[in-house]
A protein has these predicted regions:
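Short, flexible loop segments at the rims of nucleotide/cofactor-binding pockets, characterized by
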Residues: 7-13, 79-82, 117-120
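Structured beta-strand-rich core segments of catalytic domains in phosphoester-bond hydrolases
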Residues: 37, 43-109
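N-terminal, active-site-proximal structural segment of metallo-dependent hydrolase catalytic domains
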Residues: 1-47, 57, 62
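A long, amphipathic alpha-helix that forms part
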Residues: 116-136
């Protein structure tokens, strides 16, 4: 199994810089992207043999995650089930037969640590989400 994780810092920008060629050359089973900074319908980027799953932030040009996979998941979850966090498009979870694959774009505390309190709440809630899934089967986490 080959898994690639990449913070693209704006997917539309890297598409013009050879993204499709890099994607094809890596031939990964799972290709997890963070910080896509896109909204639904902004870019039609499909690859033969892959299914794609997207979690868009409500705020335009902000965060966002995606997973491309050659394997059909048993289920897909968007977010961690906490409304306070799930509007930012930060997490996608694929349930596979033997494991969960979680891609995450964790939030930044920002200049002057403006969001530090929120970041700490996020960390606690994300950890609880991972531990709850871990009770069912192994969890693979990627992202930043």
């Amino acid at each position: 199994m080959k898994l690639i994780s990449w913070n693209v810092n704006g997917l539309r920008a890297v598409v013009g810089k050879g993204f499709a060629e890099i994607f094809a050359s890596l031939d990964a089973d799972f290709f997890c992207l963070q910080e896509t900074k896109m909204q639904a319908g902004q870019l039609d980027l499909e690859f033969e043999g892959y299914q794609s799953y997207w979690n868009f932030a409500e705020k335009k040009g902000y965060s966002g995650t995606a997973i491309y996979t050659k394997h059909t998941p048993l289920s897909v979850a968007y977010g961690i089930g906490v409304d306070e966090h799930d509007h930012e498009g930060r997490v996608i979870t694929l349930e596979m037969p033997d494991f969960y694959l979680v891609t995450c774009y964790s939030l930044n505390s920002q200049d002057g640590l403006r969001r530090l309190d929120y970041r700490m709440t996020w960390e606690d809630d994300f950890r609880a989400y991972l531990l709850a899934n871990k009770k069912k089967k192994p969890v693979i986490v990627c992202g930043d």
